[in-house]
Amino acid sequence: MDTNETDRNAQAILSDGVYKDDDLLAAGKKIDLHMHSTFSDGVFTPDELVKMRKDEGYDVVAVTDHDGAKGVKEALAAGEKYGVKVVPGIEIGTVMNVSDIIPEACDKSMNKGEVELHILGYNIDPDNKALCDQMQKIKDFRDERNRKLLWYFQEKGFDIKYDDLIRTPGQEYVAKPDFAWVFVNRGYVQNVSEAFRSEKFLAAKAVQRLKQMPYPTGDAIKLIQGAGGAAVLAHPMKIKGIGEKGSDEFFDNLIRLITRLKEMGLAGLEISHPSATPEDSERLVDISHRTGLKITMGSDYHGPQNKKRA
């Protein structure tokens, strides 16, 4: 893909639903560009999500399922049906080695300089072959990881079967949150947060080592561009290993990270998210100005248990 085409894809964010700063502040503009459906780890179908947001008065929405775009067509059809703009989207889990730009990350991250980053893709073609093929590879890797997790907990004496992890009909995406919900429903823990914090469950070192496919961030950005889309860094305040969240060190390192990502083709930054305080969002807007990135906003909605802030 040539530079001009990449620039056009980046600009497509603006025309297809991601607004400039002053537009975000304009009266009546309501957008949510980060939601998850039953095609990944959400509770509602794409149709239900779009209708819900339409009923709440939203103008532009995106269903951005984890590592897959199978729900995009249903979301687009729902947009036509309910009269709301739907941006075709996806969220891809990636890893990036930042030891050359943030040396201290080698001491703060589990993987010696590697940080986990989620990359949102907007205006993608959900039928793009390269995108579909790579998402299938990630799914196959995740399925094998889930079998290992299942075996681990069975060996620890927990009565848990694969079918227990399926929370919605036709669910293809199974991940650690599904294990957490099983532990909640069986009464082993009080809530999902406890399941993730407890070393008896998902915080166990053996479990922590069983990660999803280590897909390089740069490859994900190129994949999104190749599918006609523009790449955006999701929930930057959730990034671990670059300093204490919200500290000056964190934001200084975030600027270094984002500068490198922009060199790779990153087009935007998610500045509003439940993990970001209003003060955090202000600093993220400032970073977007300094780095020349577009901005997006999203609730990261998975279901009624989520806080909604978009």
PLM regions with names:
Residues 5-22, 26-40, 44-45, 56, ...:
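Domain-core and long-helix interface of multi-subunit machines
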Residues 25-175, 264, 270-308:
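A metal-dependent hydrolase metal-coordination microenvironment
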